């Protein structure tokens, strides 16, 4: 039974749509699950602060997860998804498929930092229970909460649904290829070319094929639930309100069409339209004196001749193994034991 305060909250959301603002500023109001019907055609379920789902009353064939803010300072995807939620709650968008929105690291958003204590995107597939992390941290509790929300969301559908998860990010540094996606390791399954075409329609033409299991959010959804899942990098980190949203027109429009069931008119896959890379080296930091041997502002996907020194630390030097080997996500400031650089080389899809 809903209280007077709950009715006021629901009315406020339908008028203003400000679920994310409410989650960040008055999280206690959405701490407990709340469900209501939107305009007699969509079931709304507030799971917890920053986690909300929408389900059309008409049966659909897709279950979609859109996540943003897994790193709190990656603002453009947060702003995109926030606007979707506002538009759905206020009736400007009508969803055609079940969709779960996750705004990941709320305290880090307030601090304008990637995380508070732990990198949330290294805590999935139960890594939050590892002895190597602070299990009392906000991020460990949040990773567990997010895993449970995703499991419940996918599990509450019917067996004929196709599952999708787009984990939206922006990168610390600029990139030679501004928008790119990481395709999680598939354990021998085929990469889906229709998904590549879909992301190409979003303005993403560069794909990095992961070569091993990881503890990222997209790998969790892919491995545990068979979802078409990607970590999608949409550009460079900017402060809230400082993003040039015209740079996100393609991804914004395509995702909006996808969740509202409008035709996508995807181009057939052609390997000439995309750049495909595979991971060659995963370079982890083993000592406090780990140091990159290139500029801190070097763009992602910058490449090097074979033998070039990429990084060093006590007892180790790390060099390019191939001509044209490129670096992605270099970050010397990670914790010991975590990935400091990915190196990638060009490849093709089977």
Curated annotation (Swiss-Prot):
GO biological process terms held by the UniProt record: arginine catabolic process to glutamate; arginine catabolic process to succinate
Cofactor(s) needed for function: Zn(2+)
Annotated InterPro entries: AspA/AstE_fam, AstE_AspA_cat, Aste_AspA_hybrid_dom, SuccinylGlu_desuccinylase
CDD domains: M14_ASTE
Molecular function GO terms recorded: hydrolase activity, acting on ester bonds; succinylglutamate desuccinylase activity; zinc ion binding
Disulfides per UniProt: none
Entry note: cofactor: Binds 1 zinc ion per subunit.
Keywords tagged on the record: Arginine metabolism, Hydrolase, Metal-binding, Zinc
EC number: 3.5.1.96
A Pfam family matched in the record: AstE_AspA_hybrid
UniProt: Zn(2+) binding residues: 71, 74, 169
Pathway(s) where this gene product acts: Amino-acid degradation; L-arginine degradation via AST pathway; L-glutamate and succinate from L-arginine: step 5/5
Known function: Transforms N(2)-succinylglutamate into succinate and glutamate.
HAMAP family assigned: Arg_catab_AstE
Family: Belongs to the AspA/AstE family. Succinylglutamate desuccinylase subfamily.
Cross-referenced PANTHER family: ASPARTOACYLASE (PTHR15162), SUCCINYLGLUTAMATE DESUCCINYLASE (PTHR15162:SF7)
Record's protein name: Succinylglutamate desuccinylase
Source organism of this protein record: Pseudoalteromonas atlantica (strain T6c / ATCC BAA-1087)
Lineage: Bacteria, Pseudomonadati, Pseudomonadota, Gammaproteobacteria, Alteromonadales
Gene from which the chain derives: astE
């Amino acid at each position: 039974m809903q209280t007077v305060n709950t009715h006021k909250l629901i009315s406020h959301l339908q008028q203003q749509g400000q679920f994310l603002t409410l989650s960040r500023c008055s999280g206690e109001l959405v701490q407990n699950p709340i469900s209501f019907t939107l305009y007699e055609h969509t079931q709304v379920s507030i799971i917890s602060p920053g986690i909300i789902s929408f389900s059309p009353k008409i049966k659909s064939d897709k279950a979609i997860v859109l996540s943003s803010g897994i790193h709190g300072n990656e603002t453009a995807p947060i702003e995109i998804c926030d606007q979707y939620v506002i538009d759905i709650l206020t009736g400007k968008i009508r969803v055609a498929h079940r969709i779960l929105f996750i705004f990941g690291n709320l305290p880090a958003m307030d601090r304008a930092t990637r995380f508070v204590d732990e990198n949330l995107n290294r805590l999935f597939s139960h890594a939050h229970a590892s002895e190597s992390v602070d299990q009392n941290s906000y991020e460990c509790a949040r990773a567990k909460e997010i895993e449970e929300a995703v499991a419940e969301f996918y599990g509450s559908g019917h067996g004929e649904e196709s599952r999708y998860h787009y984990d939206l990010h922006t990168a610390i540094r600029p990139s030679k290829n501004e928008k790119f996606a990481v395709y999680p390791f598939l354990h021998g399954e085929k990469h889906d070319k229709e998904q590549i075409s879909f992301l190409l329609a979003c303005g993403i033409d560069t794909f990095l094929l992961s070569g091993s299991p990881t503890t990222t959010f997209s790998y969790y959804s892919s491995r545990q639930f068979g979802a078409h899942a990607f970590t999608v990098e949409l550009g460079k980190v900017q402060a809230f309100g400082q993003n040039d949203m015209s740079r996100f027109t393609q991804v914004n429009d395509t995702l909006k069409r996808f969740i509202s069931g409008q035709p996508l008119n995807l181009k057939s896959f052609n390997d000439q339209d995309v750049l495909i890379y595979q991971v060659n080296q995963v370079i982890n930091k083993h000592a406090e004196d780990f140091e990159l041997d290139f500029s801190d502002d070097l763009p992602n996907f910058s490449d090097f001749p074979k033998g070039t020194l990429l990084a060093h630390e006590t007892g180790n030097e790390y060099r390019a193994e191939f001509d044209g080997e490129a670096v992605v996500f270099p970050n010397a400031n990670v914790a010991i034991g975590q990935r400091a650089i990915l190196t990638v080389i060009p490849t093709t899809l089977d």
